[in-house]
Curated annotation (Swiss-Prot):
The gene is cys-11. Its main location: cytoplasm. GO terms for molecular function: adenylylsulfate kinase activity; ATP binding; sulfate adenylyltransferase (ATP) activity. This is Sulfate adenylyltransferase. It comes from Neurospora crassa (strain ATCC 24698 / 74-OR23-1A / CBS 708.71 / DSM 1257 / FGSC 987). SUPFAM superfamilies: Nucleotidylyl transferase, P-loop containing nucleoside triphosphate hydrolases, PUA domain-like. The lineage of its organism: Eukaryota, Fungi, Dikarya, Ascomycota, Pezizomycotina.
Amino acid sequence: MSNPPHGGVLKDLIARDLPRHAELEAEAETLPALLLSERQLCDLELILNGGFSPLEGFMNQEDYNDVVKENRLASGLLFSMPITLDVSEETISELGLKAGARITLRDFRDDRNLAILTVDDVYKPDKALEAKEVFGGDEEHPAVKFLYETAKEYYVGGKLEAVNKLQHYDFVDLRYSPAEIRTHFDKLGWSRVVAFQTRNPMHRAHRELTVRAARSHHANVLIHPVVGLTKPGDIDHFTRVRVYKALLPRYPNGMAVLGLLPLAMRMGGPREAIWHAIIRKNHGATHFIVGRDHAGPGKNSKGVDFYGPYDAQYAVEKYRDELGIEVVPFQMMTYLPDSDEYAPVDQIPKGVRTLNISGTELRARLRSGREIPEWFSYPEVVKVLRESHPPRSQQGFTVLFTGYPNSGKDQIARALQVTLNQQGGRSVSLFLGENIRHELSSELGYNREDRDKNIARIAFVASELTRSGAAVIAAPIAPFEKARQNARELVEKYGDFYLVHVATPLEYCEKTDKRGIYAKARAGEIENFTGVNDPYETPAKPDLVVDCEKQSVRSIVHQIILLLESQGLLDRF
């Protein structure tokens, strides 16, 4: 018999509303519709299938306020994470959102009707309070950045009626709903289940940790990785799931099963650990492993941890009686080479020799093709990782030039393209400012909003080419720091990004202008001209600073080649 769900009843809205499917589908076609984002789809799926029980919809203002301030729903039941549907003021007006209104929620990928929302209320959240109480308030925290930069200004609360399941086309056999995994446990005869949350590949230490947890609690293991949204820069879920499948035979026969969780993580540390425990309880687990820095986003730009290493364990311990799932705290596992075994760090006697490979070191070994020892990971796991992580000389990268008009960006970019093409080994794509404006952004103007859109489009194309192993060279003006930083973050999901500030002085750019564009701008014939009547924000942290007044194009290209070579991106001779 699996663990009762949070609140006592599994809120499986898919099963509840299935008898009314035809009626709801017909009504959904007649209602105003809202296309959901990827994060909203993740939340919706886990509301509809009962993963977020006792929720039956997106939180209204009363529930939201109590969760933010007290870790509880208005009913008093423990719940630590706000589950909200954010909308803009424009959307409120377009869809007629008000109490009692009904709207269809659709999948942005295929326009499929997923649910009908009956609006309870529309409210403006206190984002500063949410950021502080739920995530700690650090503006560099990814969830706080999402609140301020991405989430719309209003939330809509209300109950849901399920119309259709979300369609998935990958690893369908592993995507158990809470009801399905509970049935699977019953079929296997499992009554005690330890759930293990992860957003990373698993290695020998993780296998040892989960087996120890199962052994000490006389339980079986549910490997329950997140395949929704995780931390930017994480290894993609396709690779990770192949790793988990490769690892599974290393468990004693019948000990472990693999199930995938379509969760949009918030990286919320202590609050998230409580939330994760509730979700695993809803999936029938009786025990839940909480490790060091559980669901933490790491460090901020000053090198300070967002959360303490064991804050998450303290949080779940505080609410253990209410959670209804036994939390299994675990220290980091470390390898002891002299005895060829793993042990928790707090159980290793002083003076005993230990070995460990950090995540940073593992990524470095994958990039360089260096050996990953068998004491750290299994050969079949390493094989999967190497398939998705070719050596540095085969990885894509982007070089983005920024500077005033006529600063020499285009000449440097063209020369760099020729140099890389001469070397060979990967395709090279060149995007010059005027070409991009003509081919990709012809309808955009030169105000700040349109300039940012132009850089965002360049970054999107560059990220896709980088992902496929190409070298991308882009030379827009890119005058604004935020747009440049957003471009870096997008491209770095898939490969290296190098910002080159072509810091040729404005006076020199104007003096050597043979096309007369500066003169026209000075005469008022060209509006929003960077350096004359529109600002240029000097890059805060460029990877390279060059100056065409003092340096030749050839010497600048050589500097860039040396930079790329030092990072292992070019073949060494």
